[in-house]
Amino acid sequence: RGLEPDRGWINLMFVRKANRRQGIAKMMVEEIEHRLCALGVKRITLAAYSPNYFFPGIDVEGYPEAIFFFEHMGYEGIESSYSMSKDLHDYHMPETWISKKEEAEKTGFRFGSFEGKDALEILEFAKNEFGGGWKRNLLMAMRVGEAEDVVTVVKYQDHIVGFAMRKIDGNVMRFGPIGVGRKFRDAGIGGILFEMKQQEMCSKGIYHLFFVSTDDPGRRFYE
């Protein structure tokens, strides 16, 4: 279990190929369900325990038998998840995004690196807007003294309204999460943060960016 008392996860499960179709997987899942139920869990998610998952979900193309198995066990597919990557060699922020950033700044937005004084506010912001997992990502970066280097924030009227970060699992190339408060979405702020993060990574000699999970709207945004 994580920060949600009524939610549990099955992060990883394998059965040796030679021992499949003997009911082993069924027994393991039933045992896990029994233990989680005893702890008060009301729903179980497969794999997607951010940020410490091996996979963001079951690979539909790679493991069709696993899909069939879990559907037979009563599990339902809820949403699709995509892994994506980008080459950052010779990256330069496009002029259109530079102009958008300047226009946003004229209306009161301020972009910059995380500072220690932002700690309590950004943790509360992340929890309220996106959930405990995002708060944990930030907290871990603070604990190892890397938040100033890996977190970019955007403020409006001196209050944090969005942020982007990287390296949540120790890999300098891993991007995310990135998010903007509900009141300020659809204003291009997320796009500005993403472009800034790419520019920052390239300037630090990090020439490859990847993330392991996003949904359909996220995929359209990054494409």
What are these regions (language model features)?
Residues 1-20:
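Active-site-proximal cofactor/substrate-binding loop regions of enzyme domains
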Residues 1-7, 130-182:
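A conserved beta-strand-loop-helix scaffold within acyl/acetyltransferase catalytic domains
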Residues 10, 44-46, 175, 209-213:
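Conserved hydrophobic beta-strand within the GNAT/NAT acetyltransferase core sheet
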Residues 15, 21-37, 180, 186-199:
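Conserved acetyl-CoA-binding loop-helix of GNAT-fold acetyltransferases
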Residues 30-105:
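Acyl-donor-binding surface of acyltransferase catalytic domains
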Residues 109-122:
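A short beta-loop-alpha structural element at the N-terminal edge
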Residues 123-127:
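A conserved mid-domain beta-alpha-beta active-site/ligand-binding segment of alpha/beta enzyme cores
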Residues 194, 215-218:
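Short glycine/proline-centered loop/turn elements that form peptide/ligand docking sites
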